[in-house]
Amino acid sequence: MFMLDDSANSFIEVSQVLIHFRGTYLMQLRDFKDGIESPGHWGFFAGHIEAEETPEQTIWREIQEELCWQPENFRYIGELIAGSRKMHVFHCELENEIETLSLMEGEEIGVFLPQEIEEKQLYSKIRNSFFPITEISYGVFNKFGKYLT
């Protein structure tokens, strides 16, 4: 179960971005591979903050690595503590068409309305089936995403 926990002293720091597109959010269906976190789950685009890297640098790097895209602007919207993770959350708008993106990590890009995300099960067009959203991504959406549309 997803729980907020402010008691931990050391965290794994992660940057995550909510990419907004015409009233919807872009999400990534994670690969179905052993050894990765939350395989086969939908999540927002994110990455671990590396040594000597700021949360902003991390999200720029991750967006470039995962989508071959450089957003014109993004903004920091807050942080969320989820167990041992400290999530630095950003928001940006996709101004171009989704077809201009190239997914380099993950199985699929999905575009979902907030009401669909609320259901916690999102449809994959590639797999023709529903898959769960990661608990952390759902927590980030609950805290921040509902208020951005």
Model region roles, listed by residue range:
Residues 103-149:
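Nudix hydrolase/Nudix homology domain
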Residues 37-41, 101, 112-113:
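A short, polar/proline- and glycine-enriched secondary-structure boundary/capping micro-motif
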Residues 49, 80, 94-96, 106, ...:
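Hydrophobic pocket-lining residues within nucleotide cofactor-binding pockets
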Residues 13, 86-90, 110:
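Short beta-strand micro-motifs in enzyme catalytic cores
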Residues 1-27, 45:
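Conserved N-terminal beta-strand and adjoining loop/helix that marks the start
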Residues 24-65:
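Conserved Nudix-box catalytic region and its N-terminal flanking loop in Nudix hydrolases
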Residues 20-25, 32-34, 50, 83-84, ...:
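Short, charged/polar surface micro-motifs in flexible loops or helix N-caps
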Residues 64-98:
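Active-site segment of metal-dependent pyrophosphate-handling enzymes
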